[in-house]
Each structure stands twice: as structure tokens, then as C-alpha cells.
Regions:
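Hydrophobic alpha-helical elements at and bordering transmembrane segments
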Residues: 5-8, 12, 214, 332, ...
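C-terminal long alpha-helix characteristic of the crotonase
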Residues: 231-232, 262-306, 415, 471-477, ...
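Active-site proximal loops enriched in glycine and acidic residues that flank catalytic Cys/His/Asp
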Residues: 313-316, 352-354, 381-385, 405-407, ...
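Charged, glycine-interspersed solvent-exposed loop segments at helix/strand-loop junctions
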Residues: 176-273, 422-502, 506-522, 526-528
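N-terminal type II signal-anchor transmembrane helix
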Residues: 2-42, 46
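Cleft-lining beta-strand/loop regions that shape enzyme active-site pockets
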Residues: 40-42, 49-175, 301-424
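Short glycine/threonine-rich loop-to-helix capping motif typified by GTGT followed
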Residues: 359-364, 498-501, 545-549
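Intrinsic disorder and flexible/low-complexity segments
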Residues: 304-344, 462, 536-591
């Protein structure tokens, strides 16, 4: 018996030591893998700035690349923050070492407004007198939109490619029929005839108002893109739409015939063409640097500057609590409070890329931003893909609001949802519930019965008060009357271009424009390089991303047509019963 105990203890000790050793080895491997991309890139004395959109992804903040991606067979994709990308392209315009930009736009990923900001930077580069050359093989809406800014667009001569340059489409999902089959009844309480968040759970098709705003939104976004494309290619918007509507852009020869590309080339012919532009005898003699590397070299972090512009990134759903992956009310309020107490911060840029969420969390964030403004520090808003509902709530009081033309904003309205799952339990699962309450309405949020009239009126009153608060704060922030705000509110989603016309924003501009404006508003500052750009919250490190990933597995529906359905169910289940939300009804993905 003693020998058995000794052997057991020895085995346990061995396993413990092995586990500790394995942990240290694993941490060492992670550190080594993370350091692979940490070496400082080198800019050739004279070279080409290469932009391969399939090898990078536009993000709000520059993050570390996932070092484990290559282990799964995937290619390493570099996340590049949109401000970092814009800053790099602007630097290249005046850098004598950069001769021209060579861009491969196929595989472009990023939000719709991020892509607009990126193209705007490319347009400024071209206006500086330097050339942009693009080569496309499988044009999509996003890739051709980017390519169209180029001086020369070359396209593969292979006629077997696939064109997906066919305009924008939005698909709205409705779950009422399946919820009926499951025995689930969702009660939606809202204010705003356009506030369609929650409609997917109570209808099997779009309401008239929802369809109206969706059509207006898609057409406004496409109109912005089509005008830019048409202007760059010196054709009319009408002719461009005619080509697309008549499916006249199928093969590379079609693009050439219609004047949308300049020449069809094989890869070998492309290499020869690049040699001519670069003035090189062989393709191998062309020196190039990738945009993510160049962005790292041209980072504008001036640690010696005594004055700071704090850039606060509010990206994701606005939620209660302090979780890291969303715009958590308590966490962001604490971050903004620290910024407020930093006497070296002389201006703040609030970068909003959020469809909204919790009203309580939104108000906490707004309150802290108001305290910064009360200190005499200007707060400038910059809108990304979304600045809607709660995203607009937190920024309506900012001293100046920049938006992209394709940003989705507004959605000034509120709603609450309470599902009743008693039918599922009793009729489908044969589970019976007997409530025991201390008071008459104690179980009204329990989801085990429908609300009665008194409870519905109670919830509606709460929604009405919050809607009135929302419109009042917008009126105060934008210098409008409450009735004027109510007329353009009602939960209606507007594009940035539309929002400018109705007074919800001040100017069409990028995050770079917002940061420049904030910097120049500081006494004694005449150039952005004179201030330190401090970003909040700090991006997650590789180790932190690894720890986060342990609790967040990839969706089994990722990449499939069911992914949007899964998101819809998650949107419902993540909304706490009875809480009031200021959230946009949908999110848009452009390909």
C-alpha cells in the first residue's frame, strides 16, 4: 500500500512538473512567434509601395497579426489600422524613395466606410503627381471601387475570371415563422416608425418603413461609389449603371471595351509593364515595400511631444459592464475618465464604429465625454462604418462631427424586447412552470408568460421617456429644436451623405481629417507632427488575443448563408429581457 501511494504521488508530481514545463515552452513559442513580425522593416533607397489587399485587412486600430494563422494553413494577413494606412499613403506622396504605388485590390476586406477612407487617401496620393497602377483579376464592388482611383488599371487577359462587380445588395432576415414553430412569441416595444430593430422577430417580411429606409440607404451608398468610379474613368453614372444593369461586364474583354480598364495583360506582360514604369531591366530588380511595413516605418508617434491628442476607439456593440471585446459602458467610462485627468491631453478624437446597444452604457460614456468638454478640451467625432443609435448618442454632443459619405448613422430611436418562451416549454418540451411571486408583476421579465396590458403600458412609458431624452440631447448637441430632431429621428437610419444634409453631422471627412482638426485646435500647434497621438484602449497583445480566443470559438456557420441567421439569433439572445436599447436594426457587409 505504501508503494502504491509513493508511485501515485510520484506520478502526480511528474505530471505537475511536465505541465509547468509545457506551459513555459508554450509561452516561449508564443513569444517567439509573436516576435517574427516585430523586426523593423527596411525601406529601399528607391522603390515601389505595394498594396496587396488580399494580404492585409483594414481595421480601426493597428493590431498584431495572429501568429497562429499559419499553423492552420492560412496565410498571414496583416491588420492595418485605417489611420495608420492613411498616414502611410500620405507620407508616400512626399517620400522621394517611393516612385509609385502598385496595387492588387482583389480580396479587399474592411468596412464600407473604411474602404471609402482608404480610397480617399489614394486619391490624394494620385493628386500629388505620383502614379497608381492596379492589376485586377476578379473584380468585386470593393476591389473595382479601389482600382478605379488608379492612373492605369490592368486586368488579366484570361477570360475565365469571375466578375462580381454588379452593384450593392442588402438581405434582411425575418424569423417570425420559425419562432412560431418553436412556440416563441416576442413582444416588441419601441418608439419610432423606422425603428426596425426587433422587426425580424415579429414579422416575416419588411415593413413599409423598413423597406423604404433600406432602399434609400443602399442607393445612397451606391450613388457615392458610382460617382467616384464614373469621375475617375471619365464616364457618366448613367452609363455605368446601364452596363451593370444589363450585365455587360462579364469578361475582361467587356471591361476593356467599356473603358473600365486600360489594358489586358498576362502576368508576364504585367511584369514587363512594371519594369517599364520603374525603369528596370528585370522584374527582380524592382524594389518594393508592402504597405503594412511602410506604415510601421512612417508611424507618427511623437513620444517627445508634450501635448497629446487622445484618440478613443469606440468599436463594437455598446454593452453594460467591462468586457474587452465590445464598447462596455463601465470600462469605457473609466478609460475616458483617465483621459480627462491627464493634463497633457489637449484634444480628443472619438472614433465611433458602433451600431449602438445599451442605453445605460451609452449614457455613461456620453457623461464622461461631457466632463472632458467642460474642462475646455475639444472633443471631435470621427465616424467609421456605423455611428448609429447608441453610437450617435455618445457623440451627438461633440464639438465637431466628421463622417464618411457611406457611414450609417442616425437611427435615433429606442426599443425593448421581451420573448415569451412558455409555448416552447409547455407544447414542445412538455415542461410545466408554476410561478410563485411576492408581488403581482414580479415575473414580468421572466419570459414565461406574455405581458399584460398594464405591463406593456409600463414598458412603453419607459421607452417614451428614453426617446424624449435621446431627442433632447441631440437637439442640444446639434443646435436644433426637439420637434426638428423628432422629424428626422423616428429610428431612421441615414448615410453620412444624407446626415450632412439634415444637420446630424458637420463635414464629410476621414479620421485623419478629424485628428488634424483636433491637433490644430490646440494653442501653439501648427502641424500634427507637433503632438503625440495617444490611442485608447490599447490594442490586445498576442498573448491577450490568445487568451481571449480560448473563450470564443469560430462560428460553425462562418462563411455560409446561415451565418446571418446565427447572428440574428445571437442578437436576440444577447439582449436582456426588458432592457431598453438604442441600436441600429442591421449591419452591412460589402464585397
Amino acid at each position: 500500500m505504501k508503494d502504491f501511494i509513493k508511485m501515485t504521488l510520484a506520478t502526480m508530481a511528474g505530471l505537475f512538473i511536465f505541465g509547468i514545463a509545457a506551459l513555459f515552452i508554450f509561452i516561449g513559442m508564443v513569444g517567439a512567434m509573436a516576435s517574427l513580425g516585430s523586426s523593423q522593416p527596411v525601406m529601399p533607397r528607391e522603390g515601389v509601395l505595394q498594396i496587396d489587399m488580399s494580404a492585409m485587412t483594414l481595421t480601426e486600430q493597428t493590431k498584431e497579426a495572429d501568429p497562429f494563422a499559419t499553423l492552420s494553413g492560412a496565410e498571414m494577413v496583416s491588420p492595418v489600422g485605417i489611420y495608420s494606412a492613411i498616414n502611410a499613403i500620405n507620407a508616400a506622396a512626399t517620400d522621394p524613395a517611393v516612385k509609385f504605388i502598385y496595387m492588387k485590390p482583389d480580396g479587399a476586406t474592411g468596412g464600407i466606410a473604411q474602404i471609402e477612407e482608404f480610397r480617399t487617401a489614394l486619391k490624394h496620393f494620385r493628386n500629388s503627381g505620383k502614379a497608381i497602377v492596379s492589376y485586377i483579376e476578379n473584380p468585386s464592388n470593393a476591389s473595382y471601387y479601389l482600382a478605379s482611383v488608379s492612373d492605369k488599371i490592368y486586368m488579366t487577359s484570361y477570360e475565365g475570371g469571375m466578375s462580381m462587380f454588379n452593384g450593392l445588395s442588402s438581405q434582411m432576415i425575418f424569423l417570425k415563422d420559425i419562432l412560431d414553430r418553436l412556440g416563441v412569441n416576442v413582444q416588441l416595444i419601441r418608439h419610432g416608425k423606422y425603428k426596425s430593430a426587433g422587426e425580424m422577430y415579429i414579422r416575416n417580411s419588411a415593413s413599409k418603413e423598413n423597406l423604404e429606409q433600406n432602399e434609400a440607404m443602399i442607393n445612397s451608398v451606391w450613388d457615392s461609389w458610382a460617382k467616384e468610379i464614373a469621375a475617375s474613368r471619365e464616364i457618366s453614372v448613367e452609363d455605368l449603371n446601364l452596363m451593370i444593369n444589363n450585365l455587360e461586364l462579364n469578361f475582361p474583354s467587356d471591361f476593356l471595351e467599356k473603358g473600365l480598364v486600360d489594358e489586358l495583360l498576362t502576368r508576364e506582360e504585367l511584369q514587363a509593364k512594371l519594369c517599364d514604369i520603374y525603369v528596370a531591366e528585370r522584374f527582380e530588380d524592382i524594389k518594393a515595400i508592402q504597405l503594412p511595413d511602410y506604415a510601421q516605418l512612417k508611424s507618427t508617434v511623437n513620444l517627445k511631444a508634450k501635448k497629446k491628442v487622445a484618440v478613443i476607439y469606440a468599436e463594437g456593440n455598446i454593452v453594460d459592464g467591462d468586457e474587452k471585446q465590445q464598447v462596455a459602458g463601465d470600462r469605457f467610462a473609466n478609460i475616458i475618465s483617465k483621459v480627462r485627468k491627464d493634463s497633457t491631453v489637449k484634444a480628443v478624437v472619438l472614433r465611433v464604429n458602433s451600431p449602438g446597444g445599451s442605453v445605460l452604457a451609452s449614457e455613461k460614456i456620453k457623461a464622461e465625454l461631457d466632463l472632458i468638454r467642460q474642462r475646455g478640451v475639444p472633443v471631435i467625432a470621427s465616424y467609421g462604418d456605423y455611428a448609429a443609435s447608441g453610437g450617435y448618442w455618445i457623440s451627438a454632443n461633440c464639438d465637431k462631427i466628421y463622417t464618411n459619405a457611406t457611414t450609417l448613422t442616425g437611427s435615433i430611436g429606442v426599443f425593448s424586447m421581451i420573448p415569451d418562451i412558455s409555448g416552447t416549454l409547455e407544447n414542445k418540451l412538455h415542461v410545466n412552470i408554476t410561478p410563485v411571486n411576492s408581488n403581482r408583476h414580479a415575473d414580468m421579465y421572466g419570459m414565461m408568460r406574455p405581458l399584460d396590458k398594464a405591463e406593456t403600458d409600463y414598458m412603453q412609458a419607459s421607452v417614451e421617456v428614453i426617446y424624449d431624452t435621446f431627442t433632447a440631447l441631440v437637439a442640444a448637441g446639434r443646435g436644433m429644436t426637439v420637434p426638428a430632431v423628432d422629424e428626422i429621428a423616428q429610428g431612421r437610419v441615414w448615410t453620412g451623405a444624407e446626415a450632412l444634409q439634415i444637420g446630424l453631422v458637420d463635414e464629410i471627412g476621414t479620421i485623419e481629417d478629424a485628428i488634424r482638426y483636433a491637433a490644430l485646435s490646440i494653442d501653439g500647434i501648427t502641424d500634427v507632427s507637433q503632438v503625440q497621438i495617444a490611442e485608447y484602449p490599447k490594442p490586445l497583445t498576442t498573448i491577450e488575443m490568445l487568451m481571449e480566443s480560448f473563450g470564443a470559438g469560430e462560428s460553425v456557420f462562418a462563411g455560409s448563408s446561415l451565418e446571418n441567421v446565427e447572428k440574428a439569433f445571437k442578437g436576440w439572445t444577447s439582449s436582456e429581457s426588458g432592457k431598453v436599447y438604442a441600436r441600429m436594426p442591421y449591419e452591412i457587409s460589402i464585397r
